[in-house]
Amino acid sequence: MYEYKKTGVEKLDAEAASKNLYGITVPIITAETTEEEGRNNPRAPFYAVYKFILDDLASAEELLSDYQRPTKNLPCTPVVHGLMARMWLEMGSRFELYPEDLNTLNNNTDLNIASKETCFTKAAEYARKVINESGAMPLTEKEWFGGDSYTTGFNSVLTNSWVWGSIMTTEDVHSYWLNFAGSMCPEQTFGYGNRKWQGYKLIG
């Protein structure tokens, strides 16, 4: 979720404030969004996107409850719970830094979150669900850095700690820009984010 956060760099933070960038994220697009609506769809406030993400994940949890995926590049219930853990951790961290944002969220949604501690508790609960459901375990420090082989650790989707990952084959890479990273990594200098396409400007 793209959202400007305070950096501590006075010039950047002041410019963000002057442009009213604090607290707004990305436009919300649903299956029902029409082309006309999409052309006039401003960036949504953080609380609306938090609500949208949580509702979407709750729906995914229900729809995937009996699904058995064939490969790790497809989502499943533990993946949904992992995303829920990340979402609640993001919210808890936000409300810890900016307590006033909790009131803003509760005044504009029906989430009724009691405190930052509630968020951290939820994050821990969902993280534990991921471990229990998937059998995945966090990497040790040695494993994180590749252990005795730099082809393991987080370098391979086959590692047990990976719950969800991209499995790239030669069939997925058609050119230097027509590939997953070329579309999804706007900060890089190849793909749609390069100087020619200037895709990086689309997230500003």
Predicted feature locations:
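Structured, solvent-exposed acidic/aromatic patches
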Residues: 2-204
